[in-house]
Amino acid sequence: MQVHAKMKLTWVRRQFRHPRMLCLLICWMMITQAFSHSVPMKISALSDNHVLVSLTPEQRYLLLPIEEDEAQAALKVIVDNEVVETLNVKLAADHVDYSVPLDLGRYTNKPVLLDVTFHNERRSTGDVKDFTAWKAMQSVAHFDTKNREKYRPLYHHTPLWGWMNDPNGMFYKDGVWHLYFQYNPYGSQWENMTWGHSTSKDLVHWTFEGCPIRPDGLGTIFSGSAVVDKTNSAGMGKDAVVAFYTSAGTSQVQSLAYSLDNGMSFTKYDGNPILTDKVPDFRDPKVFWNADLNAWNLILAAGQQMNIYSSKDLKNWTFESAFGREYGNHDGVWECPDLMKLPVEGTKEAKWLLLCNINPGGPFGGSATQYFVGSFDGHKFVCESQPKVTKWMDYGKDHYATVTFDNAPDNRRVALAWMSNWQYGNQVPTQQFRSANSVPRDLGLFVDQGETYVSVTPSRELLALRGDKVSHPTAACEILIDLRSQAQPTTITLSNAHHEQVVMTYQPKDHTFSMDRTASGITDFSNHFKAITIAPTHGKLTQLRLFIDKCSVEAFDASGRMAMTNLVFPRVPYDKLTVSKGARVTIYDLK
């Protein structure tokens, strides 16, 4: 480092003769070096694809340079002859797309060994010691999370960096909404599943809190849920937060962890796993308190069905029944269930809603959320529809893994989804991060022509985002379109100067709403992205609510009868709106 600094000063003296300028630049370099510098390291190539890297980190984070087109390399972090962390990472061979932080704060100024095994066959033709990764690694005190992505949403939750998919473990406690999520902190594509954690007081503005549940000997951490144990059922403490998740190792088993600090940190239960089975796809436990049964219920995906269990103590579970073999869509894997009791609009009746996420098998390809309505006595769910009836919660291509918050105030059922699709989620044109959650939605039930359907309404917290009324769309806005007087088809077009557009059509006679994103902007990253999606409206639409946010368009019937979520990637934001004659339009800039 001293030689490197000396070379810098020599260059400065040649370029700048003015003493004041020279002094300022020297101070700037000293400040820069205090926060970021290359790491002295020894590279030992054991074979064409196996490297040992010896280093002594001087600051908290080691920046790992990523090249997305490369294959995963297996990396072990070894301190004092013990493996303290294992991960898979696409280390840069030729160039750096972006960097991700490896937190070595516990080992500052201690010898650290990185054991790296590359899996790509091309490694045998190159000298691994010369890879760009070793030259580009930096030790930094703080990781810069400043947004450099033009498609990062303004009012949707996103990870600061890395990959995110399913929302997990969501609960509300003491005025704070807690969102956990499937997270890869070491790259912007799926890998290294960990629970990330964010908190919010308004469901809109989120603070990243870290990764409280990390992989262990049982495997990586797949999806699950969390509950507030108000009566100390589990014996972990009154009001403890108890989390349930799938440990995905050589098999998929269910594990438990508990928190005594409102979900900021977790202790894994010594008796893990708490639930096992021989089914290969055995995952995503959703736990809830059933007041009718005066006990806890757990529902999880088990192959092509949902298994239901009961418990008094959250640790010992009794199998009750299975649902789904003959019901709904089975074109893909069933996963991420939820089960809840909801009032039926306009009646004094309540029914049970079972959410079942499926991939593939969605109505327009890839992943989607189907659901069933019926009765549940704590032991068995009975669907009221015919077995071949399939109902979809959202008729866009980018709404998946929908689950709800536990312990929400006012008996609300607030849902979040992953706003992407497994057909192309790893390829969308962002790098620093990939994926966002949908806007929060309140769920209910309504009846149309003898069938009961789920109602989906944007949560009331979104109203606080409204800023000034504006005359044209912005990159982040809400558009209200009054359709009460529309007897003929209504066409709504969002467009920009690049002739990119999203075309929506309401057909009052057919009771359908469609969205065409085939010319919406960048679409060539996947053959599956161009699409026209169509939804039933269950009667006449009175008002359409459109939420636009950098890379998404979410459309809702104001009364909750229809929802449609689609990603879009315009080269510049849509700034023009055209609507068929007769429809009144109001646009709010969202702040």
Identify what each model region corresponds to:
Residues M1-R17:
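N-terminal secretory signal peptides that target proteins for export/translocation
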Residues C23-Q33:
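Bacterial N-terminal signal peptides
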Residues M41-N81, L104-R123, F143, G346-K348, ...:
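Beta-rich accessory regions
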Residues I43-S47, V83-L102, F131-N168, G187-W190, ...:
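Surface loop/turn signatures of beta-propeller and other carbohydrate-active proteins
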Residues L64, L114-V116, D166-Y186, F208-C211, ...:
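Hydrophobic core segments of beta-strands in well-ordered, beta-rich domains
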Residues A73-A74, T125, W190-T194, S251-A257, ...:
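Structural motif
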Residues A74, D80, Y151, T158, ...:
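Beta-propeller domains
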Residues G196-S200, S255-N262, S310-K312, S367-G378, ...:
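Beta-propeller blade signature
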